[in-house]
Structure formats: C-alpha cells, structure tokens
Amino acid sequence: SMNEVAQIMNTEFIHPDGQRLVVSLALMDSGDQTDEVYDFCLLNSDWVLPSKGTSTMLSNYRLSTINKAGSNANGMTLVLVDGGKYKDMIAARMRKPNGRGSWMVYKDCDLDYAEQVTAEHKVTERVNGKVVQKWVPKTTHADNHYLDCEVYAAAAADMQGVRSLYLQSQEPEKPKKPEPAPTPEENWIRQNESWV
C-alpha cells in the first residue's frame, strides 16, 4: 500500500559511522493508478516525484509539468524517463567484471529480484520502415517491476548528481608554496659550511 511505501521510504538508515541517512529523492511510476500516484507525490513532495517512461527523448530524463485541469497535481513536476537508455546502462554494467562501475548485488540476492531485473532483452525490429532497437520482455507476461525500479532509481540518482559524488570526496591537491628566497645570512652559511 502507499502507506507502507511512505513508512519504508521515511525510515532512517544508520550508517556504521553513526550518520543518519534518509531517501532524498525517489521517482514513482505514474503510468498506472495515475491519480493515486499524483496524490501520494503531493503528500510526500519532499522526497518523491511522479515519473513516466518514454522512449522518444534525446536525454536520459526531462522535467515536465503536469497539465491536468481540475487535479490537485496540476502544475506539479513530472519526470519523463527514457527507460531504454537506463536499461542500456544497467545491461552494460551487468556485463562488467565485479568492481567499480559494475552491477553488483548482495550475495543472498532474492531470486525474484534477479529474475525481474533481467526479465527484458534488447531486440531489433522494423517499425514504419526503420530499423530500431528496443527493450522487450523475454517471455510473455514476465514481471519486470524491479527492473523498472532500478531504472527510476538510476534517473533519481542522476537528478541528484550521484555519479559525480566521488569527485567531491577527493580533496584537490594543495598547491605547493614556493620556498622563500634565502636570506643573505643563509647564503653565507651555505657558501661557508666549512667555517665550523
């Protein structure tokens, strides 16, 4: 239920160093139960935005405005997400060996999650005389909810600038201060080191 979603998403995660973390942004698919999702997003606008998948964009995501006269959501931000681009990224990371930039999961990963996150594959089709590639379910009626969750999580992470966070943790090299010019006394000592 939506109440359970709100409860989980507002739960604090306590990092081993004691830092308390909460979800700062989540995207919720508004393609189904649109009005219910819009109402939920209005009530929880501090951390969730409605989103909708699309495949006709030049960018990974785009902010739009809901234009629904008579709705409480009229004027609210809607995030349009190119699911195909994010699925391409996820698939590419799954093919990488474990390590930085790869797709890794917890060793006791739930089988249902694993099956859903890999429930689609990319196929080549001819549409209106043009050859296009698109993501489709591997089998009829295959659940792909967790894959969609990962797509929206990746879009939310991009909106928050997560990919560049590692740059903030790297301290810039401090420029070395030029050594001051030696004083006349220091020069005399260097030139006459054997005077002692």
Language model segments and positions:
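Extracellular low-complexity, Gly/Ser/Thr-rich intrinsically disordered linkers
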Residues: Q116-L165
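Charge-dense, low-complexity polyampholytic segments
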Residues: V162-P175
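Mg2+-dependent endonuclease catalytic cores in nucleic-acid-processing enzymes, primarily RNase H-like
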Residues: S1-K130, P172-V196
